Amino acid sequence: MSTLVRAALCALLWAAPAGAETTAMTYLCDRGVSVPVVYVPDADPAIAVLYIEGRLIHLQTMPSGSGARYGWPSDGSSYEWWEHQGRARLGWHEGASDAMTPIYTDCVPQD
């Protein structure tokens, strides 16, 4: 079993409520980077667990004008994952300045 699969299973055990439905997807982003994501839409709030830069990142659903936006509800800095119409992007949200720095801008689900 690969390290990535083990990490995803651990994330699910930690993040998902008992009996919650999950959806696992891997996105192919710019520069050829793969981003595995496990969505837990039945959690309250809904969550996404991403494996990026060698770490598991747990994000919660956030208000968005369109699409599904995940971040961390605080005044500090955090990753932000935004999925809209089959595409996604990952950025770093700087809490103090409210600036968004793109990390991966064109992520599409792998077949």
Q: At which residue positions do the language-model features occur?
A:
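Low-complexity, intrinsically disordered short peptide segments enriched in small/polar/basic residues
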Residues: 1-2, 34
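N-terminal signal peptide c-region/cleavage motif recognized by signal peptidases
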Residues: 15-17
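Sec-dependent signal peptide recognition
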Residues: 2-10
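Cysteine-centric segments in proteins
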Residues: 21-111
